[in-house]
Regions:
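Short acidic-glycine-tyrosine-enriched beta hairpin
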Residues: 115, 130-160
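A short hydrophobic beta-strand segment most commonly corresponding to one strand
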Residues: 115-117, 168-183
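Ligand-binding loop in jelly-roll beta-barrel domains
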Residues: 149, 155-176
Length: 233
């Protein structure tokens, strides 16, 4: 498939625009230089492709001009997503997520491959194991993700996580999802039931504020929960 420049979805400054375009170029190369896995287009088990995406994210966040202030604005009601670019062929979408202190995602698996890198501040990633018999997720471990951390995740219940900003200052992360730009809020997250009663009750408390992919539909409801989980990662 011939490379096509992804259309910018907002108006970044020139240095940010150039950095985002370089990231798009690298992602295009990743698609065109690696053979699809058997489950294409999910590419859940395509190690060469995942390594290409990981390298593209690492190089992108090393550029101090990647995100201008317009892409780093937060929201007091829940973490905010800024859609930066979308592939003209619908193969991927790129977003910056801004996490104010105390904000977190729901516990979720993914309908597609995705990757993220921490650009600013520090996130905490909680990892979960899927219990097929119980149809629920159990917490395994928690890992700090400081600026510079890069992760690429496969689709499916083999990779379930939750991201949170447990620090006292803003955090910003860069995400790429294997969906078209128009699907970023509806076809990425796969919300799962959590086994632990405490966490499960927290998820349940916000369920009325989220659609099936964790997209916020009633921010004021989400804001009332003890842990402000919203949107998607
Ligand atoms: Fe995620």
């Amino acid at each position: 498939m011939k490379s096509t420049a992804a259309a910018p979805l907002f108006q970044p400054c020139s240095s940010a625009r150039a950095a985002i375009q370089r990231l798009c170029d690298h992602l295009n190369e990743a698609f065109e230089s690696t053979a699809p896995a058997g489950d294409s287009p999910l590419r859940s088990s395509d190690a060469a492709f995942a390594q290409r995406v990981r390298s593209a994210l690492a190089e992108a966040i090393a550029d101090p001009g990647l995100l201008d202030e317009s892409a780093c604005k937060g929201d007091a009601h829940g973490y905010r997503r800024h859609l930066l670019a979308a592939d003209a062929h619908g193969r991927y979408a790129i977003a910056a997520l801004v996490w104010m202190p105390g904000q977190a995602s729901p516990v979720h698996a993914h309908h597609t491959w995705c990757g993220y890198a921490v650009v600013e501040g520090k996130l905490t990633e909680s990892l979960y194991r899927w219990d097929e018999a119980g149809a629920c997720a159990t917490a395994c471990r928690t890992q700090p993700r400081a600026a510079g951390a890069v992760s690429v995740t496969r689709a499916g219940h083999a990779a379930i996580h939750r991201l949170a900003n447990e620090s006292g200052r803003r955090a910003v992360s860069l995400h790429v999802y294997g969906v078209a730009g128009a699907q970023i809020a509806t076809h990425v997250n796969d919300l799962v039931r959590v086994a632990e009663s405490g966490v499960e009750s927290s998820i349940g408390a916000i369920s009325s504020g989220l659609n099936r992919d964790g997209q916020t539909v009633a921010p004021d409801v989400v804001a009332q929960t003890p842990v402000r989980e919203a949107a998607l990662t």
